[in-house]
């Protein structure tokens, strides 16, 4: 119970911090990934957030569970933990607990 409340508080603080940052680009690092989303850390704030794979609009990515990476269907790009990308904050909904990003490009 207490751990869940703490996580909800951290998420609320993250949303409040990003609300005035709409339209701002952030360099980000992938901290984890799965078949539906990547978890990124936004620099320099060290805020972590889940980003749906559909946000990565440069290709259609599939998760390789054995090798723990995403593979692009058209371009063959491999996405791994630690990879850097640029994301733009486009919407923050504090009440709905949601932050939406636009994918701006890969940094490495």
Residue ranges and their predicted role:
Residues 1-108:
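Structured C-terminal cores of nucleic-acid metabolism proteins
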């Amino acid at each position: 119970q207490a751990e869940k409340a703490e996580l909800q508080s951290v998420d609320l603080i993250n949303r409040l911090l990003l609300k005035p940052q709409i339209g701002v680009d952030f360099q980000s690092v992938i901290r984890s990934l799965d078949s539906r989303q990547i978890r990124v850390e936004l620099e320099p704030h060290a805020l972590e957030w889940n980003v749906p794979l559909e946000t990565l609009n440069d290709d259609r990515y599939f998760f390789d569970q054995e090798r723990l990476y995403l593979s692009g269907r058209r371009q063959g790009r491999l996405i791994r933990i630690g990879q850097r990308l640029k994301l733009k904050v486009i919407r923050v909904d504090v009440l709905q607990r949601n932050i939406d990003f636009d994918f701006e490009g890969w940094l490495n």
